[in-house]
Each structure stands twice: as C-alpha cells, then as structure tokens.
C-alpha cells in the first residue's frame, strides 16, 4: 500500500508540475489579453456616446479609467511580454512551451472537422 501511494504521489507531482508550468507560461498572455480587451471595449463605448462619453454624467468614463489600470497592475503588459519572451518561453528547458504547443496541436487535430472550431 505504501508503494502504491508513492507511485500515485509521483504521478500527482508530475501533474502538478505540468499545470504549474502552464500557469507560469500563460499568465502573461491572459493578463495582457484581458486588460487590453477591457480597455478596447470601454474605448468603443465612449465612441458610441460621442464627445459626451468623457463626461462624468455617464459611467463609461470611469469604466475606461478603471480598465486602463488593469494593464498596469502586476507589471505593465509590456513588462509581462518581455518576461514571457526573455524568461518563461525557455523556462524548464522549454518543456512548458513544448507541452503547450503539443496540447494545442492535439486540440487542433481533434477539432479539425468541427463546424465552428475547424478551418473555414
């Protein structure tokens, strides 16, 4: 029984290391995409109001200011991008990046005939 737990623990440790590596790799991408999209949405909302979108009479001006700060918190998106390219892509000997690309390839292959996810 003791060996069984140790064997399972080894597999759990491998899974944990894999998932930790994916989180490390993808965090800068998720942060940048989310914060950039939030600002773009608010920017378009201001455009729909015309010049009045900048007035405090409408909440969209506050939303825009609030969304801009997302790209600054936890390191600006540009700093995160430099960290991704300079450090995280090659982290763990590039294994995290290779694992992600392998998973992405499997996903693409599995969904190649999907009406929405497949090729146009």
What are these regions (language model features)?
Residues 1-120:
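Flavin-dependent oxidoreductase catalytic core characteristic
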